[in-house]
């Protein structure tokens, strides 16, 4: 049975960025990996929801679903919504891709294609790791980090 990947895009007031994020799903390799994508609108006050709906109409082949929180639950609350959705719909893996265009989903492809993702309960990516390509920052940023592919932590 093929592995089921859910992409979760938390969205709050990211009307201009969310179409770029959704466009990442159109990449051939990404589309082959992703079973479904949910965009969780956390009660945006701009045109985020309309931007997602417009994108979905323009790309009906993309397996994207828009969910709207009853109230603004914050980022953590939106994560809970996504985790619950993933469990209820029997997904094997959940990938978080922020709606404000912080990351590139293609960065996870080598991990998935190699099968290394199966060794860990959680894999975290960071744009601030030394080998990351940081875009749009005016000053160098240095962070101490743990590499998810080297360390597994069971909670």
Model-derived features with residue positions:
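Donor nucleotide-sugar binding loop of glycosyltransferases
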Residues: 14-17, 44, 104
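A conserved acidic beta->alpha catalytic loop
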Residues: 41-50
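Acceptor/aglycone-binding surface of glycosyltransferases and processive sugar-polymer synthases
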Residues: 69-88, 93, 105-153
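Conserved sequence signature across two-component system core domains
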Residues: 11, 40-42, 69
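A short, conserved beta-strand element in the Rossmann-like catalytic core
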Residues: 43, 74, 102
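Short, well-formed alpha-helical segments that are part of the catalytic scaffolds
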Residues: 14-28
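Cell-envelope/extracellular polymer assembly enzymes that use nucleotide-activated donors
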Residues: 4-6, 36
């Amino acid at each position: 049975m093929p592995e089921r990947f859910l992409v979760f895009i938390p969205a709050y007031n990211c009307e201009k960025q969310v179409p770029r994020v959704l466009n990442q799903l159109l990449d051939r390799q990404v589309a082959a990996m992703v079973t479904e994508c949910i965009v969780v609108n956390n009660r945006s006050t701009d045109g985020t929801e309309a931007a997602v709906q417009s994108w979905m109409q323009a790309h009906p082949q993309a397996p994207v679903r828009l969910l709207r929180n009853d109230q603004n639950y914050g980022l953590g609350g939106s994560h809970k919504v996504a985790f619950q959705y993933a469990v209820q719909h029997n997904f094997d893996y959940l990938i978080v891709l922020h709606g404000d265009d912080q990351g590139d989903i293609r960065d996870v492809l080598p991990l998935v294609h190699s099968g290394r993702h199966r060794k860990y309960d959680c894999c975290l990516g960071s744009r601030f790791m030394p080998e990351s390509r940081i875009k749009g920052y005016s000053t160098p940023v240095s962070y101490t980090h743990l590499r998810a592919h080297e360390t597994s932590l069971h909670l």
